[in-house]
Amino acid sequence: MIELILYSAFILLLVRHRFFWVARHRKLSSKDSPLIMAHRGLKTNSPENTISSYKEAIAAGFGALELDILQTKDGELICSHNFDLERESNGVGWAQHSDYNKLKDIQMGVYTHPRNTQTIARLEDVLNEIPKNIFLNIEIKTHSLFDLS
């Protein structure tokens, strides 16, 4: 009997979550207006995943941002799509194997925006800089499938 009650409770929770769950009771869009999100910020004048690119997107009228984060060796959360530093910065090596103090002066956008490079943004700094009314979709990057630390 207890198994039936637990199974029923599980099914009810699953149905409730699937059909009735809403993030923070916030209306994200209506049928007439889809939610348009700036993917990694607006990259027209600034490197992606930088505070400058997020502010640029907000100034352009975006009400939602998508940003990628990963964890450094010392536990800081930084905004970067890639683990390898060479792809989008003047750094060398892997972000997850480096302490934030080693990464904080690295310039992002050396290939895409050489006249407007920016430092790596920490998630904490982004949350302090971005207005509270902006919806954030934070994509957590993990180096392996089961790395959720």
Placement of each model-derived feature along the sequence:
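Catalytic domains of carbohydrate-active enzymes, especially glycoside hydrolases
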Residues: S53-Q71, V126
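Structural preference for beta-strand elements that scaffold enzyme active sites
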Residues: L35-M37, A64, F135-N137
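A cross-domain feature marking catalytic cores of carbohydrate-active enzymes
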Residues: R40, L67-I69, I138-I140
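Metal-dependent phosphodiesterase/phospholipase catalytic core, i.e.
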Residues: I2-A23, H81-S149
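Short, motif-level signal for alpha-helix interfacial/capping segments enriched in acidic residues
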Residues: R16-F19, L42-A60, Q118
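Feature marks short, surface-exposed loop/turn motifs that line or immediately flank catalytic pockets
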Residues: T44, K73, S144
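N-terminal signal-anchor transmembrane helix
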Residues: F19-A38, L42-T44, I51
